[in-house]
Amino acid sequence: SAASDVYKRQGKENKPIAIGETAYEMYEKEPPSIHVSFPLQHGVIAHMQDMIALWNYMNYSLSGKKKIKGCEYYLAVPADITEVEKQAYSQIISRGETKPKKVFLVDKPVANAFGLGLDVEKLRGAMIIDVGADTTEISVLSLGGIVVSKLLPSGGNELDMLIRSYVRKEYNFLIGRRTAEQAKKELIAATTLDRSMKLVGRDVVKGLPGEITLTSAAVAPLATTFFETIITQARSIMEHTPPEISMDIKERGIYLTGGSSEIHGLAALLQTKTGVAVNISDKPQETAVSGLGYFAEHSKQAAKYVTLMK
């Protein structure tokens, strides 16, 4: 996601100068004196020092460059990662400059459930599919707990890579990651197959800058390939879910959230392939955050769902 991008200046101080969308806009255009880092990859922390720098920068930006101390922090993390990987999330805060009072970890499927407004304690069965940038987490919850959760190393960024590979193979043309992402948003979001857009890049044969025209009809099969990965896993989980819970999922429907869940066609194909209605989050990029907000405001009621890190 954009929030996990760090923009850093190389040198003795190595200070962040931008994060998020501002940093990403400079990606693939940076000079040698600038380094772009993606410290969070496939649901886990790939670069601890960069992640700590990102954390400090975010806090300074939100607090008017004042140090925040003595606060309680709630972090949503994938359920299907190791305890060591979960511990790394809490270390971001404990090793940063915020000096936390307490750090709580919440399994992201549970945070999503609360963010969706579900009565988690009485919930008999619900499937939540969280499609992010680098990962997709498919979870089944029942009676306040997670029955099963599977983290796939497949998110919206994979579709960007499929588009880049297709353009390279079919047109002998190289495009950057940001260009591929723009094509994804413009063409796959199209409700018809007659939309087109010009892509700027480099001709592999000539070795010179150029442009090509890509159509929504051309990239539609790529989207289907991406969707099928998610749908196949969702069906597999449903097939191995106890019958009583499966019936509740059938009645309640599948909940779809996450920034990449908005890619056109995913919800419709998921419903067709599973035979289960799909409920799309009103604010898919904010669902887990809304859940964390509930925990922060109702700490006593939420105590059973959070883990206090030491």
Where are these regions (language model features)?
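Nucleotide/phosphate-binding catalytic cleft detector across ATP-hydrolyzing
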Residues: 1-128, 141-254, 261-283, 287-288, ...
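Short acidic, Gly/Ser-rich segments with clustered Asp/Glu that frequently serve as metal-coordination loops
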Residues: 133-135
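A structural feature that tracks compact, well-ordered secondary-structure segments
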Residues: 137-139
